[in-house]
């Protein structure tokens, strides 16, 4: 088992990155090692809890030979603008065939186990017994989008914030309802909004119409219906954090551009001109 290499600076750990192999919860996944990328911003050595970001990557032209670093480089997991102590985890998915990946090991509570494992490894590295989760953020790009919806349906710790970057393709009509999963998002959205404004959350969907437009627009309708029942002053604030938006960027660039801004503030306004 590899050790996380942390660099203390005064009373904090400086920002860093590590790659771990043979992650227990990910053992059923086919693909290369290492299978887990962990990143963190500045974290106080006395911290009892941290925010956690889990990022589900999409397909790869390299198929089963894809190195995890390929996805880390374009993930947008840049926390330099984030003030809260945060640990990000990017698990390698399960290679199916051709370019396709999914995340079956994160179903049935697997994401909870992944988060617990990552925090345990980090806590051990700083000489702590445990670290608790404060806020949980789930982000997904491309082929990671629909698996993220499935993960939410089977987790004991639903995310406070959900960011999906051109990933809501819907289901193959040959296997059933192409809009299956909307009911999960609607349930999560209702539960999430019930916690506002005391515990703020977000749902940001960035999409390209010809690729993920139909499902994404249905999510937009769910948001509109839910916010219609909210007191107007609060609804105005929520609309900045719960919304869908058309991307003016090429598919592969969306997460790398948008996620750093959303990790800084979930109500971020994107300047597509730059």
Question: Which residues are covered by each model-predicted region?
Answer:
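Alpha/beta-hydrolase fold nucleophile elbow
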Residues: 129-142
């Amino acid at each position: 088992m590899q050790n996380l290499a942390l660099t203390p600076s005064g009373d904090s750990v400086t920002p860093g990155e590590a790659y771990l192999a043979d992650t227990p919860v990910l053992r059923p996944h086919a693909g290369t090692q290492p299978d887990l990328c962990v990143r963190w911003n500045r974290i106080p050595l006395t911290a009892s809890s941290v925010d956690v970001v889990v990022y589900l990557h999409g397909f790869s032209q390299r198929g089963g030979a894809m190195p995890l670093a390929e996805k880390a480089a374009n993930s947008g997991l840049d926390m330099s603008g984030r003030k809260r102590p945060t640990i990000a985890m990017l698990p390698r998915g399960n290679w199916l065939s051709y370019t396709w990946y999914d995340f079956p090991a994160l179903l049935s509570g697997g994401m909870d186990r992944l988060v617990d494992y990552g925090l345990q490894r980090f806590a051990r590295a700083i000489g702590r017994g445990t670290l608790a989760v404060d806020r949980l953020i789930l982000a997904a790009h491309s082929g990671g989008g629909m698996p993220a919806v499935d993960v939410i349906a089977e987790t004991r710790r639903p995310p406070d914030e959900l960011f999906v970057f051109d990933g809501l393709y819907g289901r193959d009509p040959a296997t059933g309802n192409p809009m299956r999963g909307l009911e999960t998002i609607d349930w999560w959205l209702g539960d999430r909004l019930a916690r506002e404004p005391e515990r703020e959350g977000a749902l940001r969907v960035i999409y390209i119409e010809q690729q993920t437009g139909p499902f994404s627009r249905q999510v937009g309708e769910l948001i509109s219906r839910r916010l219609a029942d909210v007191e107007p002053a609060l609804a105005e604030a929520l609309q900045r954090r719960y919304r869908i938006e058309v991307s003016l960027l090429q598919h592969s660039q969306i997460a790398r551009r948008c996620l750093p801004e959303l990790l800084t503030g979930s109500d971020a306004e994107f300047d597509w001109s730059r």
